[in-house]
Amino acid sequence: MRYPASEKLEIIRLVEHSSLPVRRTLTKLGIPRATFYRWYDRYSGGGPEALTDRSPRPDRVWNRIPDEVRQRIIQLAIEQPALSPRELAVRFTDNQSYFVSEASVYRLLKAHDLIASPAFIVIKAADAFKDKTTAPNQLWQTDFTYLKVIGWGWFYLSTVLDDFSRYIVAWKLCTTMKAEDVTATLELALQASGLDQTELANRPRLLSDNGSSYIAGDLANWLGARNIKHLRGAPYHPMTQGKIERWHQTLKNRILLENYFLTGDLETQIAAFVDDYNHRRYHESIDNLTPADVYFGRGPIILAERERIKRETIANRRLQHRLQAA
């Protein structure tokens, strides 16, 4: 069976984000492993465009992006070098009300030496909790990560992340990793979400690892008094909390580019990054929406608007091609 490039890309995305091993995922999809890895090698070396089977027929030039639009895409890429082709395509569509695909952006940037080969990695371990969430505030993930302030030593960032939307509900930079630091962060999360004012029956569940602060009796008592059910991940399997683990890695990749000599400077940078992550960073796993879009329920409206923009853009390109050919 011959698959179009769009379906090959979708299959690769499914395998990347599957909680099952690669072999089992491919078996369920009915895709031979040799075929998948041939696609994946082409994708890793040339991006989405490399998945297209070469045809002797001429390209459909009617869908070519106009030169003026191409220049605007290039300018955005220069101004936002940290954005991937996927993120650039979504941001351009949202901000300019003009649809461009990830493959088109990748091809354009590649032609102008503005991109290297993509660093796509097939995920081999489960990165999602087994009971899927269906709405915000059903399940929160929490964990600590280490950050250093020169001359002051190590500090510990405690974070509460909403499982469904990836939204950072609350965070706190702590000097210890005690149960009281966990409860302080959770108190901030309850206040920020407004759940401190709701019925106890509507409180989220909490997912953590088995660190000493999370198995403490004081935390259990605090959670019990607030009707928050505590779930703990499987020992020696941190990918149960894959979303917050990836958040920590994303944070450190940005934050640790600089040295910090004052805790206030570190907190300022964390606050700025959390704001960017929540409100401006597009996540492929949530339909290229931002965590805030999903958490606050704006997703359906945004996705409907993108689909409208896509239809109008393609219709306009067809019309312009016909006018030029007449």
List each language-model region with its residue ranges.
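Mobile-element integrase/transposase regions
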Residues: 68, 98-99, 107-161, 167, ...
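C-terminal domain-tail junction helix/linker
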Residues: 2, 217, 224-228, 249-326
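RNase H-like polynucleotidyl transferase catalytic core
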Residues: 203-210, 224-243, 257-263
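Basic, flexible linker segments flanking DNA-binding modules
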Residues: 41, 45-139, 237-238, 296-301
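Acidic/histidine-rich, metal-coordinating catalytic segments
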Residues: 186, 198-216, 236, 287-292
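Short coil turns linking two alpha-helices in DNA-binding domains
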Residues: 32-35, 101
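Short alpha-helical "recognition helix" segments of helix-turn-helix
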Residues: 23-29, 88
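Short, amphipathic alpha-helical "recognition" segments used to contact nucleic acids or chromatin
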Residues: 3-20, 70-79
